[in-house]
Amino acid sequence: MEKLEQLINNQIKDWSLDQKFYKDKDIYNLEIEKIYMNSWLLAGHESQIPNPGDYFLFNLLTESVIIIRGKDGLIRAFMNVCRHRGSHVCLESKGNVKRLMCPYHAWTYNLEGDLVAAKNLSTDIDKKNLSLHNCSIELIEGLIMINFSDHPKSIEMMKQELTAPMQMFGMKDLKIAAHRNYSIDANWKLAVENYNECYHCAPAHPEYAKSHSLKYDESSKEYELAQKPMKDTLIKCGMKDYDIAADYDAQIESQEQYAYHRYALFGGYITGSEDGQPLAPLIGDITDYNPGASDFNLGPVSFLLAYSDHVVAYVFSPVTHHTSQCDVYWMVDNDAKEGGDYDLERLIWLWDVTTKADERIIVNNQKGVNSRKYSSGPFSEKESTEKRFISWYLDQLRETL
């Protein structure tokens, strides 16, 4: 711990992290416990489980969670661990069940997680004490958030401040049209750092940069001028202008972090498509296509990117200390029909090609970080969110000392 404290204290402000933060297994284990086991994570959307008994699994490292809709219509989350000898109860990634039965010894639980059958169990044992372990769960406008902590930080401020912009995009009435998992041979922090900056967007993402004004420095005249058409048409399109920042070093004490910001698309683009033209029916309260894109932060590693006709969700997670993954979800209006209202390949094109490019970038970054010649370098002014992420990350580690 003394070595970690020294490492944190030696870290130069607004410079990239020391190599040990990306390679040390002990630091990685601390990160898992302090950050991933204590943060709210986007697990999915309630449209995935519309009927009683519908469930899907959310897996992270050694943990598996059953997210299930009960007979009462409520959505609950249980740890996928039988209270007998620990076997996984659900083996399929999704399905519909009348009861949850462990495949090992047939211990059986109802949809509320109560143990209802355990053959040959002593009558001295009270089944009420052997319910499935709960996992903390919250719904925000249809989005399912989970937290592995027994005492999670509050998510109430996130709900209060993000409900209005989420309703604007009709989040509750969306469905997942596509889900892709991207493996990344790099430390999870390099993946999150990359997502949090657009310094690389112009040189590395020509498909994105030709349509999204975030490639500019947000303090530049070019960026300011690009915002005017988007802002001038917000009201006409049934939208409102919000700007919410309670993320990373602006996180409110005892609350999960969150943020919302909207920025413009360039002329000729009204959504995140290859040709700038609509991809799907309008969503939420939006009455016409507004030439912009909105970023949501839902905790430290879950993000949304919202256009007038679809929403893209990103969730970053570690696999090992030197590998990670990114789950990407494309969401459209719940009534939209594939092949008629939207073409799946056109829908996913931009963020599929961009994420694949990011994977290459991040892996190359990790290869350089592995070198004996790697040393920290200064962030640019255009990497302000990355600076804030690093500052927040170091504070999380300090709290473990």
What is each PLM-predicted segment?
Residues 5-21, 172:
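Short, contiguous pre-domain boundary segments
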Residues 37-49, 116-121, 295-300:
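Short Pro/Gly-enriched beta-strand edge/turn motifs at strand-loop
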Residues 80, 143-401:
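C-terminal catalytic domain of Rieske-type non-heme iron oxygenases
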